[in-house]
């Protein structure tokens, strides 16, 4: 059967003629050397040109990455080898290597060597650790040496292809060739080694339009590939896939099966002659160089052929060899998340086909290997052949003895106990099939689910799935598309009822067969179910799980990984990469069981599971509960103080929030708790919280709102002591302590403001303040200081100043004490008063100093409302006054408030 090989173009880079290409082993870069003397580096993931080296004015026929040194090494027609640092773009070294055009460069995989070949018929070995000295010269060819390649299985051996129509195999340390292969009728342009361990083969391409496969141990030609219409310019064994890639001046790239030598595919991208090809171990990318640019194609799928059963036995294919590893053999070895597991690998033998996929059946007894359009079912223990056949696709049913194959684009067959049970043709054809509780068939029209037993249509859905994953219970299914994934619930009871009564059955199946639970805009690469939790790897290399509408990230992966399975007794999730490395991550089954129970609203089960969840995992569970709307349970479960505090605030749990705030000693938490306490009318608690938070602004608001003069007084002193000058000023001002306000402004250097305050409220102090202002300003600007006018010296500039002195004395005598809040309705608003008029005829009975000595300030004389506005409301105010007669602010019960106790004792 033909090799099923998907071919996808990843990059098209238009440029001058490309003479060589190379792929970087770790970065997504392609190196292309051009006939115009430049070397370009393209990023094939972003489709961008990232670096350019202007090497010379002549063709650069060879360029290679040396990743371990961050170098690009080039060879050109000016006979020079140049070495560039591809990070800094600087030229590290340059020397003349040959006496004619340099055709090829080969980098030794482990030693500090490069090999170069040239039109001077020589091959030279250079050692960069010895200042690029020439360590050896290999002579023997009688024409241009077109290509050299190092044997991947023996790094001391290399082969060369020459226009003298021969292939020579050499050994490092020996100046003469080990042997020569002859058979081409014209010059040989290219050569490559087979990297697998099963065949000692070489491939060559020549101007006779032929490709030859050689056994270099027997020194014989084992196969000749014909088909190209012009000179063969490049030929290569792919290091991963069972294919041979050849390119020719006829503009085509041909892909051949490396075992059957059958032509599998011919590529023609219309970019004229093909000159070079490059591939890389561990990657399915192939770079091609043409007259008009370069191309990268991706062959096949990079997902490894690998599968794990429920007991931890892993089977994978390495080329055609099948190997097994057992997680149980690791014993109690300490495992760290994301670290490669040191597994003992056991060879199980070779497979008759090249495995593209391997999959255990649900009970793990059998394993199916698919590839080359065929399938073989083996016993999982001994890899004994149980059944085989031709199929384009294979899918296991939930019943371990049942499976389906897609024989063609129109026929699907179902087998039970390895015998054909039923064959049917889906209505709209079959482009792909999916296993599980129902048989899924994708067609051009969408996805159809069929009953395994009778192939009856259950439901047709207009969707183009990429993967389908069923939960073990069969209740939930994930349908992953190219852009998102859907979580559906399979309603089996309604399906059975509809099948019996035939109600609700349409041409698209049973309408109530599925219920959509959610759609998530994320691309699923691989996935599996554990209970009601769907675990998956995403396109951005994240390991997540989805439960109840919430996505939880387990880990950020540093490379593409593929899910193998979950073993509950280990509480670990296992993944593999394309290099067949196995890693694991901790994922507690108790957490998944708890979340599953919550989703099913089975809280009795959730309560039983909760004690088995470790404390370090409780907060994750609490976040899940919070998102599901169970905040009270989340508060009980969470162990994170920050999370518990937020939940306590949301739930109005003042006691819990208070305890957490005491433990945290965070100003922010005290402020948040104060807001909650105020909203709950717990003013005593609010005062304590604001005090801990040193929130003087909040304390001032609380004190003024409650009319607590003593608290305002203490607050003023404390705020001034702690440098909260704005709050201190406002507190003094609210108490009418204008002298304290003035002194505060002077002490803090706010002399202009002090002068204006004195002019407005304390005219007797204005002269002193202006003098201070003038002295201070003179240090900066003498002229500006001299321009300040003292009101006592320039009375003509300050009309009404003398009257202001009288008013100041009048205010001091008549406003010595604060008025009770109950008199507020009887006091004229400031904006309606004329203090000058009120103080007319006032004669100070004694000086302010005498009053201060007596300590007996005059009783306050409230100014009864006489404004027009007040007269209109006189009746209502009198009624209000009657109501207030029996109400004293001191009579209010403040036992829970204690606003004036220990305000700032600390």
UniProtKB/Swiss-Prot annotation:
Record-listed Phosphothreonine modification sites: 861
Chain residue ranges for the region called Disordered: 837-872
Coiled coil: 866-891
Start-end of each WD repeat: 13-52, 55-94, 97-136, 140-180, 183-224, 227-266, 350-388, 390-425, 746-783
Keyword annotations: Acetylation, Coiled coil, Cytoplasm, Cytoplasmic vesicle, ER-Golgi transport, Golgi apparatus, Membrane, Phosphoprotein, Protein transport, Repeat, Transport, WD repeat
Cellular compartments annotated: Cytoplasm, Cytosol; Golgi apparatus membrane; Cytoplasmic vesicle, COPI-coated vesicle membrane
GO molecular function: protein kinase C binding; structural molecule activity
One Pfam family linked to the record: TPR_COPA_B
Topological type in the membrane: Peripheral membrane protein
Residue positions, PTM N6-acetyllysine: 627
PROSITE patterns on file: WD_REPEATS_2, WD_REPEATS_REGION
GO biological process, one term: intra-Golgi vesicle-mediated transport
CDD domains named in the record: Coatomer_WDAD_beta-like, WD40
InterPro entries: Beta-prop_COPA/B_2nd (IPR006692), Coatomer_complex_subunit (IPR050844), COPB2 (IPR016453), G-protein_beta_WD-40_rep (IPR020472), TPR_COPA_B (IPR056176), WD40/YVTN_repeat-like_dom_sf (IPR015943), WD40_repeat_dom_sf (IPR036322), WD40_rpt (IPR001680)
Sequence positions bearing Phosphoserine: 859
GO terms under cellular component: COPI vesicle coat; cytosol; Golgi apparatus; Golgi membrane
Function, in words: The coatomer is a cytosolic protein complex that binds to dilysine motifs and reversibly associates with Golgi non-clathrin-coated vesicles, which further mediate biosynthetic protein transport from the ER, via the Golgi up to the trans Golgi network. Coatomer complex is required for budding from Golgi membranes, and is essential for the retrograde Golgi-to-ER transport of dilysine-tagged proteins. This coatomer complex protein, essential for Golgi budding and vesicular trafficking, is a selective binding protein (RACK) for protein kinase C, epsilon type. It binds to Golgi membranes in a GTP-dependent manner.
Family: Belongs to the WD repeat COPB2 family.
Assembly notes: Oligomeric complex that consists of at least the alpha, beta, beta', gamma, delta, epsilon and zeta subunits. Probably interacts with PEX11A. Interacts with SCYL1. Interacts with JAGN1.
Protein name (database record): Coatomer subunit beta'
Organism: Bos taurus (Bovine)
Lineage, top ranks: Eukaryota, Metazoa, Chordata, Craniata, Vertebrata
